[in-house]
Amino acid sequence: MVAACRSVAGLLPRRRRCFPARAPLLRVALCLLCWTPAAVRAVPELGLWLETVNDKSGPLIFRKTMFNSTDIKLSVKSFHCSGPVKFTIVWHLKYHTCHNEHSNLEELFQKHKLSVDEDFCHYLKNDNCWTTKNENLDCNSDSQVFPSLNNKELINIRNVSNQERSMDVVARTQKDGFHIFIVSIKTENTDASWNLNVSLSMIGPHGYISASDWPLMIFYMVMCIVYILYGILWLTWSACYWKDILRIQFWIAAVIFLGMLEKAVFYSEYQNISNTGLSTQGLLIFAELISAIKRTLARLLVIIVSLGYGIVKPRLGTVMHRVIGLGLLYLIFAAVEGVMRVIGGSNHLAVVLDDIILAVIDSIFVWFIFISLAQTMKTLRLRKNTVKFSLYRHFKNTLIFAVLASIVFMGWTTKTFRIAKCQSDWMERWVDDAFWSFLFSLILIVIMFLWRPSANNQRYAFMPLIDDSDDEIEEFMVTSENLTEGIKLRASKSVSNGTAKPATSENFDEDLKWVEENIPSSFTDVALPVLVDSDEEIMTRSEMAEKMFSSEKIM
């Protein structure tokens, strides 16, 4: 990662300074971007599972963050038994404070360090652990319905009206927080062949959604409303001043639309999980792709604003190719990272590698943004364009605030969720996903107000006569040099015998008249010094000076 950060300079345009003056925040931000893992949006937790268990299967292990008084329902939907079999089904509900505690249970079962007959509550230290057992459950080939599973203690504390609805409830949580639910199925006849299709559901006060995902669902709903308000506000401004809309304002409209679409799709996915308990993988992948496009376009928007596109420069030239290439690179890796996280989980190797690459690309974005912004502000200061300079000064202050907020937040998340031995702050986990969307929404509203359509919109537009770009200045110089060469040839005329005719005052007047008629006034300032420096003109000037000096003596 360090080598990747050091190689960033080779990918950018050459400058005398790699960083703008007085930019310690940029160095700190780049270091944190290289060393801190990228923020990973967690896949929402399910609320309904359908599992197949046979005579060779081990215990079923389920993990979820649940509210207090969440009902856990367990039932056998279908079964197949080759002969008469008596089942003993035992389930254990364990509450634990640390989210990363007991994360290796599946590995222990695979290595046979834990057996099916193990007392899991004893292994899990018995604290906040409840065990329930249903014995002598008959199953044979003639059975039509598998015996229902229940917890007598829970049935006794329910009233009669809710008793029928609660027959499948096998456990109920006593606290808000992380829980592990383990189901162990044993038979007396170990040689019997059998197959069970088990259904498990966890329904809390807000439906199937987990306690850690419920605040995130509310956040996406609020942000969707916020982006709708952004869109209405921007459309209103654009409709009032549609004749003066700048090119940069179309980019802002596209970012607002994609942000609204992204939040709407994520909210619908979380709402679907809350209602059904199941996640629609296709909808989740679509949401991740929309998010990747929106994040890419948002970064490109900040870069082209920093470069002064449409404000200081009419076009970006070859720099635009680098910006688009960097954006496409980010889009590809962001899309792959999102899809692989949905399919393979957050710990998949491809996800980890993509996170590292995205961190490096983000550091390049930060580098590019600050260098371009410093160059744009320097140009505006030299041109003494106070209106545009004030605009970019406010934008710079917004980016500095975003960098400071990112540094503080990355330090907090690293301490709380990544290096902590006991990850107990489950109520704040949604902030790890929501912060970056909220921070960009603040940057976007600042950009909207700074570049909003208005009656004075053209104050911020590029003016060819005032805001000439560097490329046009170079083209002007080349054209001027070509013109002066022609003027030098015009200064000495040949006669028929091949000898040069010396310049006289009449020739000088003719040359001056030709210059005034054929060369624009903006070019004479560059062309005239070359004309004056010719030998003939030096002689003419000296003769005129002598005449004027002699006339003064006579007077």
UniProtKB/Swiss-Prot annotation:
Signal peptide: 1-42
Sequence ranges on the Lumenal membrane side: 43-214, 269-299, 344-350, 418-429
Species annotation: Homo sapiens (Human)
UniProt gene name: TMEM87B
Glycosylation positions in this chain: N68, N197, N272
GO biological process: retrograde transport, endosome to Golgi
Official protein name in the record: Transmembrane protein 87B
Primary role: May be involved in retrograde transport from endosomes to the trans-Golgi network (TGN).
Keywords, ordered alphabetically: Glycoprotein, Golgi apparatus, Membrane, Phosphoprotein, Signal, Transmembrane, Transmembrane helix
